[in-house]
């Protein structure tokens, strides 16, 4: 397994305030890491640092040579007054052919959206188009900023299953950002809890019981947490439960 990117003792300081404080982590190929933390914890700054958009104040970042990073932002801001099709939007990503656009959309099961109006896409459709754009360059590392934001439960389930299939198809690492453990992918290899520094890390179930996580998120976590375990041989209703009566795992609640 190849180490794609390593942060060692990274700090980012704005106006004498440590937004990122002594963070060390490694991202390996074919692994999924989920970064969680409350608003203002430094998640966006850490993502910018990984993408190379934010220079660390101190510490070191090592990247695999010719590392290709695909990025899916939390939300796309478009000028509503300017008409833009999905095809036109994908053209902005670089010199790729229409066939390459179609192939990328097919990977995310959205080829039917090629000529659709970007302004009229649902939250789930927008995420798939953004994901297709990121896949055009065949990334080694896929960075997803709050991918489930604004997507309904069924859409989240489908999106996570799609991310899992992409991980295997490209043998790429996935670094995913979330504000909480709610519906964290069951296939996540590691959860990192950030509050400017790394409070704790580990499997989702172990993080939910960690004293530092509990201290950070408080008792409200009991109503918020559910770990989604995807089964491939059935359909889901809108609640995310199997709709065909098959025997499979229910969503698993996290306990204290």
Curated annotation (Swiss-Prot):
Region of interest: Disordered: 232-256
Catalytic reactions of this protein: Zn(2+)(out) + ATP(in) + H2O(in) = Zn(2+)(in) + ADP(in) + phosphate(in) + H(+)(in)
One GO BP annotation of this record: response to zinc ion
Membrane topology: Peripheral membrane protein
Keywords for this protein: ATP-binding, Cell inner membrane, Cell membrane, Ion transport, Membrane, Nucleotide-binding, Translocase, Transport, Zinc, Zinc transport
Domain of life per record: Bacteria
Subunit and partners: The complex is composed of two ATP-binding proteins (ZnuC), two transmembrane proteins (ZnuB) and a solute-binding protein (ZnuA).
PANTHER family in the cross-refs: METAL TRANSPORT SYSTEM ATP-BINDING PROTEIN TM_0124-RELATED, ZINC IMPORT ATP-BINDING PROTEIN ZNUC
Name of the protein: Zinc import ATP-binding protein ZnuC 1
Source species of the chain: Aliivibrio fischeri (strain ATCC 700601 / ES114)
Gene from which this protein is expressed: znuC1
